[in-house]
A protein has these predicted regions:
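Non-catalytic DNA-binding core/recognition domains of DNA-processing enzymes
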Residues: 1-8, 23, 105
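Alpha-helix N-cap/helix-start motif at helix boundaries, enriched for small hydrophobics
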Residues: 2, 59, 71-76
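Alpha-helix C-caps/helix-loop-beta hinges
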Residues: 5-8, 12, 79
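Basic, Lys/Arg- and aromatic-enriched nucleic-acid-binding interface segment
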Residues: 11-70
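Conserved tyrosine-mediated DNA breakage-rejoining catalytic core shared by Y-recombinases
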Residues: 22-39, 66, 75-114
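Short basic/aromatic active-site micro-motif
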Residues: 55-56, 128-132, 148-168
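C-terminal catalytic core of tyrosine-transesterase DNA break-rejoin enzymes
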Residues: 61, 65-72, 137-140, 157-170
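Active-site/catalytic core of tyrosine-dependent DNA strand-transfer enzymes
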Residues: 106-148
Length: 170
């Protein structure tokens, strides 16, 4: 912030030189953590006493199998789940880019949709869910499952990619 103010002051002629000109701060790039297949299985098998944690776990697993972003999952409607040749698919557009996408629904995501259909409001598949609540509860899910990694909801999308690559290489 201060560097920006000084740069603007120098550009506008308010100071003769920019004392920060030689300093460059490189971004702190952190390697993203991911879950192993065994950790995903452990999360799926864990029995939660708290129904909120069970919901958060199931939505995270849904994302692992569909690669939907949080906002795309949050806005997923029953109209976007269609049957094609006897199989269920999600046909929608990305919220962020408006680019169409399609995802075949495997058994586990279908079971999750069925489990939470009572939450459906205004055709939303999972009702109203809050991102920050989800993130906070996801930390509790990981802790209760004995996973000591800093996992975000976005991590589920990366699991889907590695899972897809693994399946396609078999």
């Amino acid at each position: 912030w201060l560097k920006g103010v000084v740069m603007r002051a120098h550009y506008n002629g308010l100071i003769p030189r920019n004392p920060f000109a030689q300093f460059h701060i490189s971004p702190n790039v952190k390697e993203r953590e991911y879950l192993t297949e065994d950790e995903i299985k452990r999360i799926m098998a864990h029995e939660f006493d708290n129904p909120t944690l069970a919901l958060v776990r199931d939505l995270f697993i849904f994302a692992c199998f569909t690669a939907l972003s949080f906002v795309d999952m949050k806005e997923l409607t029953t109209d976007e789940i269609v049957e094609v040749n006897g199989e269920k698919w999600i046909l929608s557009k990305r919220h962020k880019t408006n680019v169409p996408f399609q995802v075949k629904l495997l058994d586990i995501p279908l079971q999750i949709i069925e489990r939470y259909k009572y939450l459906s409001e205004d055709r939303l598949v999972f009702g109203k869910i809050n991102y920050w609540t989800m993130c906070k509860q996801l930390k509790k899910v990981m802790a209760e499952c004995g996973i000591e990694k800093q996992i975000s909801y976005h991590c589920a999308r990366h699991h889907h990619l590695s899972y897809t690559l693994k399946i396609s290489s078999l």
